[in-house]
Amino acid sequence: MSKEEILQAIKNMTVLELAELVKALEEEFGVSAAAPVAVAAAPAAGAPAAAPAEEKTEFDVILQEVGSDKIKVIKVVREITGLGLKEAKDLVDSVPKPIKEGVSKEEANQIKAKFEEVGAKVEIK
């Protein structure tokens, strides 16, 4: 039986049949389907307590201060967020406010640079 035939047979199974298959595989090979998750979550007994922190991959750009040229800041907000004029003005009037959330470090730095060009202060979290 080829790999493709096995996959096709699995695709045609019901949920109950799949559950029975998993149980049979666990018994046949002496493994547990949940074991890899439990092992990954628990630190090893001899492992160092403080592992290096993972580098953040998503950042939030927060407008802290508008500066002297509010109109230019509103234009940048509209360019980055796609908001309408009124929504962008309301956002600028109620700082500190998040401008963009969950963006890459590179994009966050580009957004920050655009705001700094028009005199606004931005924080990246």
UniProtKB/Swiss-Prot annotation:
Pfam families: Ribosomal_L12, Ribosomal_L12_N
GO molecular function, one term: structural constituent of ribosome
Keywords: Ribonucleoprotein, Ribosomal protein
GO CC aspect terms: cytosolic large ribosomal subunit
GO BP annotation list: translation
InterPro entries recorded: Ribosomal_bL12, Ribosomal_bL12_C, Ribosomal_bL12_C/ClpS-like, Ribosomal_bL12_oligo, Ribosomal_bL12_oligo_N_sf
Stored Gene3D superfamilies: 3.30.1390.10, Single helix bin
NCBIfam families the UniProt entry points to: L12
Assembly notes: Homodimer. Part of the ribosomal stalk of the 50S ribosomal subunit. Forms a multimeric L10(L12)X complex, where L10 forms an elongated spine to which 2 to 4 L12 dimers bind in a sequential fashion. Binds GTP-bound translation factors.
Similarity-based family: Belongs to the bacterial ribosomal protein bL12 family.
Function: Forms part of the ribosomal stalk which helps the ribosome interact with GTP-bound translation factors. Is thus essential for accurate translation.
Name the record gives this protein: Large ribosomal subunit protein bL12
Lineage, broadest ranks: Bacteria, Bacillati, Bacillota, Clostridia, Thermoanaerobacterales
